[in-house]
């Protein structure tokens, strides 16, 4: 059961229907950018096992904060090594289970299907492209997609010119929604999120060296003892899950 982006404490995400006899329920806290891939993976895993998976989706910062406050979760998949580091520093990861699972890239998307491509480089007149419009981004000081986007703009010398026009959203899917709804002409999102949108067009990809590497670590949380959580973590590295991640455009990192 996938739960959409969280606007109230994630503790509620652990409330689900009772699992079948002999089955176990696994609560997965995952970055919002994994929405589409995890929906497919959850369905396949539940069909292959007797277990039930509850997926709570939000910005990695929100999820990490809730885990550190005692939210009952079994698996954490972050879009940022920093937020996984914070959870690990509190002793909340099962030792030896952390793995760098996936990679991603960030892109500039435009509303509609007829936007012209641009070369993302230091002399890009992004403010000119925006005109009087807004640039949709996830929270630039908290959510990984926003942090990566701001770092890329800053590294290219573009941030100061567009900062007043940035419209911040709670997570990357919400930022993308600003663009697909026509509320912002442009946005910065993960390439994988852009691929899932029918009413937005990728007009440029940010150079990989303009921002820190985008890595999604996953780990078994030590906060609860649910044997099936190790099974699900292994499944995330197996062929079915890897194929689902690849279909959404993620780079596979874990062997």
Q: Where are the language model's segments positioned?
A:
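Bacterial N-terminal signal peptides that target proteins for export
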Residues: 1-11
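N-terminal signal peptide c-region/cleavage motif recognized by signal peptidases
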Residues: 18-23
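Leucine-biased recognition of intrinsically disordered, low-complexity hydrophobic segments
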Residues: 11, 15-17
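Exported/periplasmic ABC-transporter solute-binding proteins
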Residues: 24-50, 54-61, 65-71, 78-81, ...
């Amino acid at each position: 059961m996938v739960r959409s982006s969280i606007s109230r404490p994630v503790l509620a995400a652990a409330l689900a229907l009772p699992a079948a006899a002999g089955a176990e329920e696994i609560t997965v806290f995952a970055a919002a950018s994994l929405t589409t891939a995890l929906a497919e993976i959850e369905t396949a895993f539940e069909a292959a096992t007797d277990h039930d998976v509850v997926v709570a989706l939000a910005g990695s910062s929100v999820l990490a904060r809730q885990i550190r406050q005692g939210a009952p979760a079994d698996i954490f998949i972050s879009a940022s090594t920093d937020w996984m580091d914070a959870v690990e520093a509190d002793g909340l990861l099962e030792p030896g289970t952390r793995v760098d699972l996936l990679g991603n890239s960030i892109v500039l998307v435009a509303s509609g299907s007829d936007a012209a491509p641009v070369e993302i480089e230091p002399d890009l007149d992004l403010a000119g492209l925006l005109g009087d419009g807004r640039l949709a981004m996830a929270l630039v000081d908290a959510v990984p997609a926003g942090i990566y986007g701001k770092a890329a703009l800053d590294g290219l010398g573009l941030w100061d010119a567009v900062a007043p026009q940035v419209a911040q959203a709670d997570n990357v899917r919400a930022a993308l929604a600003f663009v697909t709804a026509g509320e912002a002409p442009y946005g910065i999102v993960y390439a994988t999120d852009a691929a899932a949108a029918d009413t937005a067009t990728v007009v440029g990809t940010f150079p990989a060296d303009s921002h820190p590497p985008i890595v999604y670590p996953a780990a078994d949380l030590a906060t609860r003892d649910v044997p099936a959580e190790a099974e699900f973590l292994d499944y995330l590295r197996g062929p079915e899950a890897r194929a689902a991640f690849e279909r959404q455009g993620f780079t596979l990192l874990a062997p």
